[in-house]
A protein has these predicted regions:
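Conserved Rossmann-like nucleotide-cofactor binding loop
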Residues: 15, 39, 131
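Glycine-rich dinucleotide-binding loop and its adjacent helix/turn
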Residues: 1, 128-162
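N-terminal Rossmann-like FAD-binding beta1-loop-alpha1 element of flavoenzymes
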Residues: 2-33, 162
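Active-site acidic short loop of glycosyltransferases
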Residues: 4-5, 121-122, 159
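Short beta-strand "acidic-cap" motif of Rossmann-like dinucleotide-binding folds
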Residues: 29-36, 44, 126
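Short hydrophobic core segments
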Residues: 8-10, 34, 112, 118-132
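Short glycine-/acidic-enriched loop or helix-start segments at secondary-structure transitions
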Residues: 19, 43-44, 105, 135-137
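N-terminal Rossmann-like dinucleotide/flavin-binding domain of flavoprotein oxidoreductases
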Residues: 45-117
Length: 162
């Protein structure tokens, strides 16, 4: 049987990186990060000028960290270096230039397809960030899940955990 990952994270931005590192440190050893760009943190790389500040708070929202991956204010360069170090130190398997075309659940596994490969996982987290374009499902999200499914953080409230 092909390799089955404990977790595949789609999206190599700060949230996706934190997710795979947290998962690995929590005991999920077989994790994979898939990113459509040629490296992680595409928004920071493409749209932040050199030496631009990168702050952990967004629009004045408190960003208390509840995991083991810390995030501090810094510059574009120090932030990218920090994420490089996290991926290297944890030996995270990451594939770049790997845009996900589909995610389908069959039995107990998710089948994740890119243009160049197919992967299987017990769990999938979609963390596509600002530049991602999710294909929202054509079915209604059950109301019981509305508090854990979010396509936009523009309206998050002060103190809300996301």
């Amino acid at each position: 049987m092909a390799n089955v990952y404990d977790l595949i994270v789609v999206g190599g931005g700060p949230c996706g990186i934190a997710a795979v590192v947290e998962a690995k440190r929590s005991g999920l050893h077989n994790v994979l990060l898939l990113e459509k760009g040629d490296n992680h943190s595409q928004t920071i790389r493409k749209f932040y000028k050199d030496n631009k500040r990168v702050d952990k708070e967004y629009k004045g929202q408190d960003s208390t960290i509840h995991g083991v991956v810390s995030f501090e204010d810094g510059t574009k360069e120090s932030t990218l270096d920090y994420f490089d170090k996290l991926l290297d130190d944890e030996r995270i398997e990451a594939f770049f230039n790997s845009e996900v075309e589909s995610i389908k659940k069959e039995s107990d596994l998710f089948h994740v397809r890119t243009a160049s490969a197919d992967y299987k996982a017990k769990n999938v987290m979609v963390s596509i960030g600002k530049m991602g374009r999710p294909n929202k499902p054509d079915y209604k999200i059950p109301p019981s899940l509305n508090n854990v499914v979010n396509f936009n953080l523009d309206n998050c409230t002060n103190g809300e955990k996301v």
